[in-house]
């Protein structure tokens, strides 16, 4: 087994989990699945078990970070691991490079209709496929169509994408310009219906599109075979880099270092205020993936407290860049004594077109099958009332074709969060100083220090690992 990059981070947690892990082992002849999403419980109970009544399956659901800690500690002991593991995107490469998965042989023909990025992201160092995903998770910009009409005079998807500059070279510049226009048009006394509208609820919604669309991930291999910390220029270099957009959105109509009037609502990403904004009239849009339509927007469109309901007032269009967010891959552990049965279960969930079609129809999930999704996209009768009758499958199918999945690394779970923290600090001139040039260097250096602390044994750092123009 290869050296685990996460050993140092999890050694303390291992002592806390020893007694708990002893109770988590496999039971008899059951196939054991560990997952962070309760979707798999439904998929097993309502679909797989009905089609495969002779196969007993035990699904154990954990919070995503707790699952990562549990898996890491089980890997250290080599015991108590499940047969099948559901992996969230940010942990995918870590587990693959830890070499704990069995290659999934003989399925390449059946996976031909999957989106390329889901395949590319889940190959081991020998180029063998070790995990498959049942869903694809293209990201887009969900926006309020009533606000677009009232504040911007926009009545069509095409007009919205032109205003955003979607997939154009200057797309983030147009995004910031739109944020400023929304603020102007909704200023006090300007509009009777919508006042003080912000383009986003939380500024760090922009992180995922930047991370997904960058050319290089957090590490590249040098001639000596070492992993070298890499900060893609799109994250920090020049106008409308990720750090620069953070600054512009958080400064808003103010001045750097002397008071800010942000273009965002300054909520905390995926906390209560962020969800509450989905039912209010203060936020214009959200950068979300396909699954968030059903699990986030629909679930929070009606406020219990105020009675306000934004259902039917949303549309979805291309974001400034093509990106993906999250997703779930399934893999067979190489410690399993039920590898054949486990692979058949994964084949059912990711390649059985009857199941995938039913699942997509029943849940609205955007599934990892081009043939089925293209049929949904072309169906004139298929529309989403929540999106004012829009057929969102056509848009998601187009976005998913643009993704490649080649920039994921073992470091993503920690370094994505760390860089986002310093991007926020830089945009608010918090802990970095309020002189623009030195603040940028301080933010980058602070991030580099955090990376060195987290991965001192597995990540080489040049001095410095960035180039300022």
Regions found by a protein language model. Name each.
Residues 126-135, 139, 168-232:
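Extracytoplasmic/periplasmic solute-binding protein
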Residues 68-81, 98, 148, 174-186, ...:
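Short helices/loops that flank or line small-molecule/ion binding pockets
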Residues 301-374:
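Extracytoplasmic/periplasmic substrate-recognition and gating elements
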Residues 1-7:
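Positively charged n-region of N-terminal signal peptides that target proteins for export
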Residues 374, 380-388, 393-469:
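Conserved C-terminal helix/tail region of periplasmic/extracytoplasmic solute-binding proteins
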Residues 87-143, 149, 306-318, 331, ...:
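Hinge/lid segment of periplasmic solute-binding proteins
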Residues 6, 17-93, 109-112, 155, ...:
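Conserved N-terminal structural module of periplasmic/extracytoplasmic solute-binding proteins
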Residues 176-180, 222-270, 310-315:
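Glycine-centered hinge/linker elements that transmit conformational signals in sensory
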């Amino acid at each position: 087994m290869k050296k685990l990059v996460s050993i140092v981070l999890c050694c303390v947690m291992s002592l806390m989990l020893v007694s708990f892990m002893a109770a988590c082992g496999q039971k008899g002849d059951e196939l054991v699945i560990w997952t962070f999403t309760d979707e798999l419980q439904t998929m097993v109970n309502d679909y797989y078990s009905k089609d495969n009544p002779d196969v007993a399956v035990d699904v154990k659901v954990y919070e995503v970070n707790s699952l990562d800690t549990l898996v890491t500690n089980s890997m250290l002991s080599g015991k108590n691991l499940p047969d099948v593991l559901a992996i969230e995107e940010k942990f995918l490469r870590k587990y693959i490079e830890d070499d704990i998965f069995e290659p999934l042989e003989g399925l390449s023909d059946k996976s031909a209709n999957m989106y390329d990025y889901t395949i590319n992201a889940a190959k081991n160092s020998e180029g063998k496929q070790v995990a498959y995903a049942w869903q694809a998770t293209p990201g887009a910009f969900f926006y309020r169509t009533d606000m677009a009409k009232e504040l911007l005079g926009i009545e069509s998807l095409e007009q919205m994408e032109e205003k955003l500059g979607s997939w154009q070279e200057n797309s983030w510049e147009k995004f910031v310009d739109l944020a400023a226009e929304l603020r102007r048009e909704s200023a006090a006394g300007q509009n009777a219906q919508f006042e003080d509208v912000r383009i986003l609820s939380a500024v760090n919604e922009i992180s995922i599109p930047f991370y997904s669309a960058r050319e290089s991930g957090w590490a590249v291999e040098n001639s000596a075979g070492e992993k070298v910390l890499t900060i893609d220029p799109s994250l920090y270099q020049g106008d409308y880099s990720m750090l620069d957009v953070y600054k512009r959105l958080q400064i808003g109509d103010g001045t750097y270092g002397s008071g800010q009037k942000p273009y965002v609502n300054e909520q905390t990403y995926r906390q209560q205020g962020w969800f509450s904004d989905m039912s209010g009239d203060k936020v214009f849009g959200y950068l979300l993936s396909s699954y968030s339509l059903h699990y986030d927007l629909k679930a929070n469109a009606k406020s219990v407290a105020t009675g306000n309901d934004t259902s039917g007032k949303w549309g979805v269009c291309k974001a400034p860049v093509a990106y993906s967010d999250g997703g779930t891959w399934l893999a067979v552990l190489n410690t399993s004594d039920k590898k054949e049965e486990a692979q058949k279960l994964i084949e059912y969930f990711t390649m059985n077109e009857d199941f995938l079609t039913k699942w997509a129809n029943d849940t609205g999930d955007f599934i990892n099958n081009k043939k089925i999704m293209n049929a949904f996209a072309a169906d004139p009768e298929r529309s989403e009332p929540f999106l004012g009758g829009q057929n969102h499958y056509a848009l998601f199918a187009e976005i998913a074709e643009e993704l490649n999945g080649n920039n994921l690394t073992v470091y993503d779970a920690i370094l994505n969060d760390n860089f986002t923290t310093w991007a926020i600090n830089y945009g608010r001139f918090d802990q970095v100083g309020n002189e623009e040039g030195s603040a940028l260097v301080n933010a980058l250096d602070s991030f580099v220090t955090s990376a060195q602390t987290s991965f001192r044994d597995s990540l080489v750092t040049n001095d410095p690992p960035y180039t300022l123009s």
